[in-house]
């Protein structure tokens, strides 16, 4: 009789504890769901990431990239740019270093030495001056591409400045940028880093319940033309790169009216 009582007591205790654990797990799941829902206003979510043709997506705290080992650079870099991020902190400029998160190894900065090309940021350091860690993270070699100096400091700089203007206008934008790699014949350095003939940049913003975008395709050379002369459709860039830039946003169109 005593043995039966003990067995019943142990069984009740077991199921009681199990139910308590299950309740806690449900609460945690609900809390996690709540946090997830609270973050849906941010454009910087995986829902906005382009597809990767290389399957090597590298996530840093403030930007994400898809690394293309064959060309020794990212095929795209994507990041959120908020109006609140636009600061002018005088951070000390760090040295470029290899990206420890790139499993195949990102190119050494010495490939650019005496090449005649700038180490052109894809996610600009100037967009990340709100935080020292964010700023320093832009100096990984996975975030650079060979750019002609007149291009880097000229027309491309004007596109970057306009991007910051749009961040202020819309308060929060999403940027995807990179080089057109598949037709890049010229290489630099011992690791044969490809030199893109063109660079692209897509800016996405939310206007009410709708999304709107503008896309640029700019030759890797200086130009005195208006940046609007280089506006193209997102479909044009997708055909050139094989990348689906916003797979979760159906019927997204880009235009000069941004």
Report each predicted region and the residues it spans.
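N-terminal secretory signal peptides that target proteins for export/translocation
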Residues: 1-2
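Domain-level detector for secreted/extracellular nuclease and nuclease-toxin modules, and
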Residues: 17-258
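Sec-dependent N-terminal signal peptides
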Residues: 5-14
């Amino acid at each position: 009789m005593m043995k039966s009582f003990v067995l019943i007591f142990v069984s009740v205790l077991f199921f009681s504890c199990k139910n308590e654990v299950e309740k806690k797990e449900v609460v945690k799941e609900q809390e996690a769901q709540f946090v997830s829902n609270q973050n849906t206003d941010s454009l910087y979510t995986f829902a906005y990431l382009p597809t990767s043709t290389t399957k090597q997506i590298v996530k840093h705290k403030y930007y994400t990239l898809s690394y293309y080992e064959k060309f020794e650079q990212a095929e795209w870099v994507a990041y959120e740019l908020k109006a609140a991020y636009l600061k002018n902190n005088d951070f000390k400029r760090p040295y470029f270093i290899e990206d420890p998160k790139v499993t195949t190894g990102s190119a050494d900065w010495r490939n650019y030495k005496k090449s005649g090309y700038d180490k052109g940021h894809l996610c600009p350091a100037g967009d990340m001056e709100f935080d020292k860690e964010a700023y320093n993270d832009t100096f990984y070699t996975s975030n650079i591409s060979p750019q002609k100096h007149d291009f880097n400091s000229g027309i491309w700089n004007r596109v970057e400045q306009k991007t910051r203007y749009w961040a202020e206008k819309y308060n929060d934008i999403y940027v995807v940028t990179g080089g057109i790699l598949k037709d890049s014949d010229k290489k630099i350095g011992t690791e044969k880093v490809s030199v893109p003939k063109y660079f692209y940049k897509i800016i996405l913003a939310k206007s009410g319940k709708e999304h709107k975008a503008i896309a640029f395709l700019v030759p890797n050379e200086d130009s005195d033309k208006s940046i609007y002369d280089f506006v193209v459709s997102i479909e044009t860039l997708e055909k050139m790169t094989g990348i689906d830039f916003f797979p979760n946003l159906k019927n997204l169109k880009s235009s000069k009216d941004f």
